[in-house]
Amino acid sequence: MNANPKFLSADAHVDAAAVAPLPNSRKVYVTGSQPDIRVPMREITQADTPTGFGGEKNPPIYVYDTSGPYTDPDAKIDIRAGLPALRQRWIEARGDTEVLPGLSSQYGLERAADPATAELRFPGLHRNPRRAQAGKNVTQMHYARQGIITPEMEYIAIRENQRRAEYIESLKSSGPNGAKLAAMMGRQHPGQAFGAAAFGANALAEITPEFVRDEVARGRAIIPANINHPESEPMIIGRNFLVKINANIGNSAVTSSIGEEVDKMTWAIRWGGDTVMDLSTGKHIHETREWIIRNSPVPIGTVPIYQALEKVNGKAEDLTWEIFRDTLIEQAEQGVDYFTIHAGVRLQYVPLTANRMTGIVSRGGSIMAKWCLAHHKESFLYEHFEEICEIMKAYDVSFSLGDGLRPGSIYDANDEAQLGELKTLGELTQIAWKHDVQVMIEGPGHVPMQLIKENMDLQLDWCKEAPFYTLGPLTTDIAPGYDHITSGIGAAMIGWFGTAMLCYVTPKEHLGLPNKDDVKEGIITYKLAAHAADLAKGHPGAQVRDNALSKARFEFRWEDQFNIGLDPDKAREFHDETLPKDSAKVAHFCSMCGPHFCSMKITQDVREFAAQQGVSETEALKKGMEVKAVEFVKTGAEIYHRQ
């Protein structure tokens, strides 16, 4: 049930389904100011509009791509070797880090020397860990506050813009109606941004490297980018950028293997996971994490207290600061990009959970609550927070300050324990920022819709606009097996109100460890929620993809409808259940309404009639009604006719 040595030592390979390009898509790269800034995007090719609808060219659209080299046919994928270290030269060029002679963590050294783990170890890493030079700070926030625009920031600006300006220009040159087409396809509704950057309805508003730098310097955005994870493609989490989503993976003591977790990671990023958290709690946590990081183009997060607990055989009361500190260094030297640390679970808050319906539901929160009660002392995470900051800034690990007292039921939403912890997280944010350490704040949980905005508003106030990262929230507790939907509702709302990253929930939430199918279902649901939030905020260019799909739908370009959507495979499968023949891919109807009741076909018939008569569509409808009225009188003015 746990790690399979034979698989890892001899047969480790990437799942073929994760490396095939999506239909009608290809990986393209946009080059920045230097040749090694090559920003990946997915180009989706579209068919020409049928002659009957104008016959214009439909240029490709570009969408944000998290899949890394896996969907690039030109890339050589070997998970035993790992991904290329694309940020290595940038890190070295800054001249503020040093390569260590070996591992610093005692546990890391023990694992490296243990012959029992030899067959499980990742074989492809041939470099020692890196750390800041003495007295140096290597965080992206530190650089931003020094006025430095790093290659990572330039990369992010290009990535966030998704070639919108080029797309609009390609529409203008698509034919005689190009200018009209560009105006139509570039149109978007003004959003309501709730205090975030107001871009209005300007689809061409540009995200600049300077804007990225300024947001990071202010603490309103983070770039999770450990110097020991040079394989990662820079991305940003902040409410003035595209809403991001996280996918949780990880083994447990009773199920899954290292190979399965690597597969889940590559599967999650294929469908749009912006970051991945490895929440492994079973055997071989260290080795599992190494395989995942070395093969991940997206930031990896962890909850270090989980592994620390394994080191004391699951006895929370036996945890010590020294064990936890060693775990932080171990994981930082592997390349973990952000740590969830439940430093806000203070002794004084634990009694406040006594009258809850569901108590403390966070694993990390319950571990720290148990430790506090066993020792009747303040949490060592809280007491040693400044020392944790010193470790974080030596590797550029970002804080994800954990909501250990989040509500686990609607009943417990917005209670004193939850909000007390949130206030403490705001205080800890200020301490981290004093060290130029990047911070995001974790949020609930289970919250009914009418209380969601209060959560967002309090977080913005108490945490001084540090990015919010929420699990849903789930808006009702009555749907086990459908909690990706109960939470997707809350996720779309809180994303609109200002949350920067949404942690996905799968259909297995509360029921079991998700498999690959569950991971995909959760990812697609949350991509949908995040995109809905971007639309509602009026984020630049958010509506481009919607407009392209709507145009394809109206023109019955079925393949384009499938391919522009979030899940081409499912869309095609559903269509083909009832209309499987190739001829149905060009038909002007689907099985919902059939050939005679398709509203879009009827609209097109009206337009065609208008063109033939040389009148406007409104006049055509009026003229058509007059013709039908004459026919009605001629047939006897009877509503019903006997057959």
UniProtKB/Swiss-Prot annotation:
Q: Which reaction does it catalyse?
A: 5-amino-1-(5-phospho-beta-D-ribosyl)imidazole + S-adenosyl-L-methionine = 4-amino-2-methyl-5-(phosphooxymethyl)pyrimidine + CO + 5'-deoxyadenosine + formate + L-methionine + 3 H(+)
User: Which residues are substrate-binding?
Assistant: N248, M277, Y306, H342, S362, R363, G364, D403, G404, L405, R406, E442, Y469
- Return the Pfam families for the record: ThiC-associated (PF13667), ThiC_Rad_SAM (PF01964)
KW Iron-sulfur (keyword) present: yes
Cofactor binding comment, as recorded: Binds 1 [4Fe-4S] cluster per subunit. The cluster is coordinated with 3 cysteines and an exchangeable S-adenosyl-L-methionine.
**MF (Gene Ontology):** 4 iron, 4 sulfur cluster binding; carbon-carbon lyase activity; zinc ion binding
Tell me its EC number(s), please.
4.1.99.17
Locate the residues binding Zn(2+): H446, H510
Broad EC category:
lyase
Q: Which cofactor does it need?
A: [4Fe-4S] cluster
Its GO biological process annotations read:
thiamine biosynthetic process; thiamine diphosphate biosynthetic process
Listed binding positions for [4Fe-4S] cluster are C590, C593, C598
Q: In which pathway does it act?
A: Cofactor biosynthesis; thiamine diphosphate biosynthesis
Tell me the first and last residues of the signal peptide: none
Q: Which UniProt keywords apply?
A: 4Fe-4S, Iron, Iron-sulfur, Lyase, Metal-binding, S-adenosyl-L-methionine, Thiamine biosynthesis, Zinc
Function of this protein?
Catalyzes the synthesis of the hydroxymethylpyrimidine phosphate (HMP-P) moiety of thiamine from aminoimidazole ribotide (AIR) in a radical S-adenosyl-L-methionine (SAM)-dependent reaction.
The molecule here is called Phosphomethylpyrimidine synthase
Write down the species.
Burkholderia cenocepacia (strain ATCC BAA-245 / DSM 16553 / LMG 16656 / NCTC 13227 / J2315 / CF5610) (Burkholderia cepacia (strain J2315))
Lineage in the entry?
Answer: Bacteria, Pseudomonadati, Pseudomonadota, Betaproteobacteria, Burkholderiales
